[in-house]
Each structure stands twice: as C-alpha cells, then as structure tokens.
UniProtKB/Swiss-Prot annotation:
It comes from Fragaria ananassa (Strawberry). Pfam families: Bet_v_1. Monomer. This is Major strawberry allergen Fra a 1-D. One of its GO terms (biological process) is abscisic acid-activated signaling pathway. One of its GO terms (molecular function) is protein phosphatase inhibitor activity. Belongs to the BetVI family. Keywords: Allergen, Pathogenesis-related protein, Plant defense. The gene is FRAA1D. GO terms for cellular component: cytoplasm; nucleus.
Length: 160
C-alpha cells in the first residue's frame, strides 16, 4: 500500500469554539441547510456520533458523486480536534483504499482561528495520487468552509 500526505493551514476570523461547533459538531445539519447542492444529507449508520461512528454522507445533485461513508476516530471538544476516515463511496477512486483526515482548530492571537488539516491518502499498491485529485478536493472543502464561515458571520448569535 502506498500513500500521500497533504497538509494545509488557513485562518478564519471566527473564534475556534464557535467554528468547531458549526464546522464539526453540527456540520451534518448545517451543511445540507446552507449548501444542499453539495450535501443532501448525513445519517448515522452505526454508533452514537462519537468515536467508532459510521456516517453516510449523500451528496447533492450538483455533485459528481453519490455518497461516501466516514468512520469517526476522535472528537475532542476541549482541544477542537477531529479525525475520521473516508472508508467507502464513489469519491474514492479505484486506486484509493481510504483517506484519513485530521482537523485541528487553534485559537489565533487576533481572536480568530488557525485551521490545520492533514489528509492521508492510502493507495492500493504503489499508485501515485494525482495532484489535480487533491487540488479538486481541497477546493471543494475550501468552498464549503467559506459557506460555513459566511453563515456564522451572517448569524452571529448562533453556535455560541
């Protein structure tokens, strides 16, 4: 099995606790509400929402994909960290076994948040991950993040 690791870091004006509540804890409700063309729904197939939980994410009509399944590894509400794996679905190509994601939201000195993400692609055999595959995923995630950030700015009393 081969692999590829991609790290990214960006900032937000939204405080880390508020952003974590929306971006991680309530994403299954918030994203279909603000971006139904991207995510139609999210449902828990196994578990209680904590570590070990398996979720099915059904994409909206504007997506090239039908669904994916996530397995949650950890959620740390105090340290604002979250990790899960994409374990099934048509977003995984024939060459990718799974993708592990780790997200950490760090309070920034200016009152906002530094968002640190790591994506680990586990390939079947020694297949190389195409840069455009990673770039496309990054752009979609960035777009969703900007929608969440915009929603929080437009609704300052939510997720406090």
């Amino acid at each position: 099995m081969g692999g590829y690791t991609y790290e990214n870091e960006f900032t937000s004006d939204i405080p880390a606790p508020k952003l974590f509540k929306a971006f991680v804890l309530d994403a299954d409700n918030l994203i279909p509400k603000i971006a139904p063309q991207a995510i139609k729904c999210a449902e828990i197939l196994e578990g209680d929402g904590g570590p070990g939980t398996i979720k099915k994410i059904t994409f909206g009509e504007g997506s090239h994909y039908g669904y994916v399944k996530h397995k949650i590894h950890s959620i740390d509400k105090e340290n604002h960290t979250y990790s899960y794996s994409l374990i099934e679905g048509d977003a995984l190509s024939d060459n990718i076994e799974k993708i592990d994601y780790e997200t950490k939201l760090v309070s920034a000195p200016h009152g906002g948040t530094i968002i640190k993400t790591t994506s680990k692609y586990h390939t079947k055999g020694d297949v190389e991950i195409k840069e455009e595959h990673v770039k496309a995923g990054k752009e979609k995630a960035s777009h969703l993040f900007k929608l969440i950030e915009g929603y929080l700015k437009d609704h300052p009393s939510e997720y406090n």
